Curated annotation (Swiss-Prot):
Annotated protein name in UniProt: LPS-assembly protein LptD
Biological process terms in GO annotation: Gram-negative-bacterium-type cell outer membrane assembly; lipopolysaccharide transport
Compartment list: Cell outer membrane
Family label: Belongs to the LptD family.
N-terminal signal peptide: 1-25
Domain of life: Bacteria
Protein's UniProt keywords contain Signal: yes
Recorded GO CC terms: cell outer membrane; transporter complex
Coiled coil: none
Pfam families xrefs: LptD
SUBUNIT field: Component of the lipopolysaccharide transport and assembly complex. Interacts with LptE and LptA.
Major site of localization recorded for this protein: membrane
Annotated function: Together with LptE, is involved in the assembly of lipopolysaccharide (LPS) at the surface of the outer membrane.
Length: 870
């Protein structure tokens, strides 16, 4: 119903102009006839009494055009007349042609009252009016129609509404409508028959309905529901119900919420949405139980501040910890978008008890004997019961070349995620929070990025045997990459450079070197491509210089390194066609050879700011440096041999199978490593790496990789994943193993336990899935098992029953929260188990609104909250 232009005020007017005038003496008899009709219709045909509950709503469903369809989710649909479905967006009533038919005798006058009798039907494209009788009143002076009275089986159809009533009175000046004993069906957007939108449909009944000139509908003694009309699972009744399309909201006074036939809640006033327009108001509450926080209940409040930014405030009460306040601010402009999230606990009683208990176990005598605990205890003493987590993510696109990004994360104490991470939907093991501001340029030949980067490292006293590594800050870091192809025939130019100022602060690890590092690597390549392959010789000059402001013994204040790099990358391509059954395929064979030469230079005097040795991978066969970062450049005189084979569908080129295998043969021993005085490797072979990707059937995929070290007779790393993805049906299982490597990172020197705490194996089995069990049942699950530690790190299970008008979901999540000190001073595993429950009555709140905490914390953890940065 478009504001101020309802068809019912115009369609009859257009057809009455020009009719022959009859005597006005019949006016009194017409009025008497209307009164007589009113007395007869005190027993309503639209809302009959004396019917059973089931028969009554079957009657209402029939009036509103409900068609049973057991195979649909709602077990039926509202069928619209063909003239409505063919014209879902009708034009103004005053401009559309109209046809009026009536089977009985009629009296039409230019002044006074005109009468249309028996099956009166008025049609326009996208509009229909039906009634047993129609009385049209005209102004005696102007001849304009001022009022229309419809009596008996009144039906009003339009593209977003259907109303059935015993009687309707339509006044043109001002434009108002009054309906008696009405049943209504309203929806937004396309009719339900065509499109499923939220709220997909709303219907109800009313003893008295008024639509005023501002397009506001007021219903007296009315009901409202979005369920199927034959047996509504829920409905609300109210003495007064206001549906305002201008504000996109509904208001109910003295509202009773019914589940089936049973009233369960009374609200003196209730505000709810009547379309999918974002509007200020309360969202669906959620509740649950956590083993570390107790029972919790949250009631989110949504504030639609402007079309391009909004705020969600979620007060949450936890029986053990007290009040927890969460807020999410979202903003969007033509060039930028982002979120700001804050989680604040004004007085965490559980954390207060933890601090007091832990501090009592470490008196000065214990600290004197075990000084490793001193920084942990000092930090605990400074912490307060007020706890907070802040996260901000913002991206700006200035134009097609320039952009910026802001990632900010801060937590008041390192135990926040251990205590609340599982309940919030994130990781309880997170110990690195990224903070980064960068500016990027992406042009045709040049790319640039300047950034400020720092991590907040979380140190928990229960992790003293395997502490998190404090990270270097980059204040600032400038990186530039250039590429000019074809500067001459078969000559390409490459360039990359970086300038970084590394800063380091830590209370847990001794001071490390700080200073500036400058790196530059220009190169020239000579690509030659031919029909069955390619060969690309390349020559590079790798230059690195340091200016150390805080250095350790054996390190110089300034130092530099200049080394040449020479490599040859080459490959061949062969293919053949073959048939398997009725299908045609293409198989390729792609051998590849890569030679790399880098002379040796002792680099023990250089600091190690950010360089690590990652597990062996297929990409390392063709890398210029086995290390990531620029603090170490390997010596190399080596040849890589690799073979790739693909099987493609000959019809569309889609991949069926891809297999890779390769290894490196070292002509010289590798002498460069991360730590001074390390033992050089005298192996002639790298691990043998193999990869396989296979799509055996539609929706199925298998990926696997294995790096086997023949020198040590052990697996370097392996991963296997089997996945199924078919729309809403998703499942996968993964296995990941990485063998520990003591030379992968610098070993901290203050640990009182021997060896490198980070050299242990990584060995996990991870499985996840989302699956519709039945037509209305859905299940999701996630499981992460740590084989090395023989424990489940995370598992979660969720089940939802979903209908067209309500949904019920239940979830359980158990998260490993690290180690805690028991009363005897021993370390004990700690788990947090959270239960969640949510009932959604669709049409009374946001459809499927997830708790703010789960959404925002997961987003934050995907944008800067992680485990150790290696």
């Amino acid at each position: 119903m478009k504001q101020g232009k309802s068809f019912i005020f115009y369609c009859l007017v257009l057809l009455l102009c020009g009719f022959q005038q009859l005597s006005s003496a019949v006016t009194a008899s017409i009025a008497k006839a209307i009164k007589t009709t009113d007395r007869k219709q005190r027993v309503s045909e639209t809302l009959p009494t004396g019917l059973s509950y089931r028969r009554f709503y079957q009657h209402i469903a029939h009036l509103l055009g409900w068609v049973p369809a057991p195979d649909l989710v709602c077990r039926g649909y509202f069928k619209e007349p063909l003239i409505l479905t063919e014209h879902p967006h009708p034009g103004p009533a005053t401009k559309e042609p109209a046809i009026v038919t009536a089977k009985g005798p009629s009296m039409v006058t230019a002044q006074g009252v005109s009468i249309l009798r028996k099956d009166v039907v008025v049609t326009q494209p996208g509009r229909i009016v039906e009634a047993d009788k129609a009385y049209i009143y005209r102004d005696s002076k102007t001849g304009h129609v001022t009022k229309i009275i419809l009596i008996g089986h009144v039906r009003l159809h339009e593209a977003d509404k259907r109303i059935v009533a015993d009687k309707g009175t339509l006044t043109l000046y001002p434009k108002t409508a009054i309906l008696m004993n009405a049943a209504y069906h309203i929806y937004n957007g396309e009719p339900y028959f065509y499109k499923f939108k939220y709220p997909f449909d709303a219907w109800g009944i009313a003893k008295h309905a008024v639509r005023d000139a501002s397009n506001v509908i007021t219903l007296r003694h009315a009901t409202y529901s979005t369920c199927k009309p034959t047996a509504p699972a829920w409905s609300m009744s109210a003495t007064t119900l206001v549906l305002n399309r201008n504000t996109h909201r509904g208001e109910a006074y003295n509202m009773l919420l019914h589940i089936g036939r049973v009233p369960i809640f009374y609200f003196p006033y209730f505000n709810f949405p009547i379309d999918n327009y974002r509007k200020t108001g309360f969202l669906i509450p959620y509740a649950g139980h956590s083993s570390s926080s107790g029972w919790f209940f949250a009631l989110p409040f949504y504030w639609n501040m402007a079309p391009n930014y909004d705020l969600t405030l979620t007060p949450e009460f936890m029986s053990e910890r007290g009040l927890n306040l969460q807020s999410l601010f979202r903003f969007l402009s033509t060039k930028s978008s982002g979120t700001i999230y804050l989680n604040y606990l004004p007085n965490d009683k559980v954390f207060q008890q933890f601090r007091e208990t832990t501090l009592s176990k470490f008196p000065p005598s214990v600290l004197a004997e075990h000084p490793v605990f001193i920084p942990y205890v000092d930090k605990l003493k400074k912490m307060k019961n007020q706890r907070a987590f802040f996260s901000m993510n913002e991206t700006t696109l200035f134009n097609s070349e320039w952009s910026s990004r802001v990632i900010l994360n801060y937590v008041t104490d390192p135990y926040f995620f251990q205590d609340l991470g599982g309940q919030l939907g994130g990781s309880s093991l997170a110990n690195q929070l990224l903070n980064q501001i960068d500016l990027q340029y992406n042009g045709l030949h040049w790319q640039f990025m300047g950034m400020l980067q720092a991590y907040q490292t979380l140190h928990l006293i229960s992790q003293w045997t395997t502490p998190a590594l404090d990270q270097y800050s980059r204040l600032p870091d400038f990186n530039i990459v250039g590429y000019y192809p074809d500067i001459a025939r078969h000559v390409d130019f490459n360039f990359n450079a970086e300038a970084v100022n590394f800063d380091y602060r830590s209370d847990f690890v001794p001071d490390k070197p700080r200073g500036q590092r400058f790196h530059m690597r220009p190169g020239i390549s000579f690509p030659f491509y031919f029909a069955s392959g390619y060969i690309i010789p390349q020559l590079w000059a790798d230059a690195t210089a340091y200016n150390i402001t805080h250095f350790q013994p054996g390190q110089a204040h300034t130092s530099s390194r200049l080394l040449p790099i020479f490599d040859i990358d080459s490959g061949l391509y062969f293919d053949r066609n073959f048939h398997l059954g009725h299908r045609s395929f293409i198989q390729t064979l792609e051998p590849r050879f890569f030679y790399l030469y880098v002379p040796y230079q002792n680099q023990d005097r250089f600091p190690n700011f950010d360089t690590v040795l990652l597990p062996f991978s297929f990409e390392q066969l063709f890398a210029l440096n086995q290390f990531t970062g620029n603090d170490r450049l390997q010596n190399a005189n080596q040849a890589s041999f690799a073979l790739t084979s693909r099987v493609l569908d000959a019809q569309n080129g889609s991949p069926i199978l891809t297999a890779n295998v390769g290894f490196i043969y070292y002509l010289e021993n590798q002498r460069v490593c991360l730590t001074p005085g390390c033992t050089p490797s005298n192996y002639h072979y790298s691990p043998i790496i193999g990869e396989l990707t296979f799509y055996p059937f539609p929706y199925w995929s298998f990926t696997g990789s294995l790096a086997w070290d023949p020198n040590l007779g052990q697996t370097n790393n392996t991963s296997v994943e089997l996945a199924y993805n078919n729309g809403g049906k998703k499942a996968d299982i993964r296995y990941l193993f990485v063998h520990g490597n003591e030379d992968s990172i610098v070993t901290p020197t203050t640990l009182i336990v021997p060896g490198n705490a980070y050299s242990q194996n990584t060995n996990h089995v991870i499985s996840s899935g989302a699956w519709p069990l039945l037509k209305k049942w859905n299940a999701v699950g996630y499981w992460d098992y740590n084989i090395t530690e023989r424990r489940t790190d995370v598992y979660s299970i969720g089940v939802q029953y979903n209908t067209c008008c309500w949904a019920l979901s239940f979830s359980i999540r158990r998260t490993y929260a690290g180690l805690k000190v028991d009363p005897n001073g021993a370390l004990q595993r700690q788990y947090d188990t959270a239960y969640g429950f949510e009932l959604q009555l669709k049409g009374l709140g946001n459809l499927g609104t997830a708790p703010i905490s789960t959404v925002t914390v997961l987003d934050a953890m995907n944008n800067g909250v992680s485990n150790d940065v290696r």
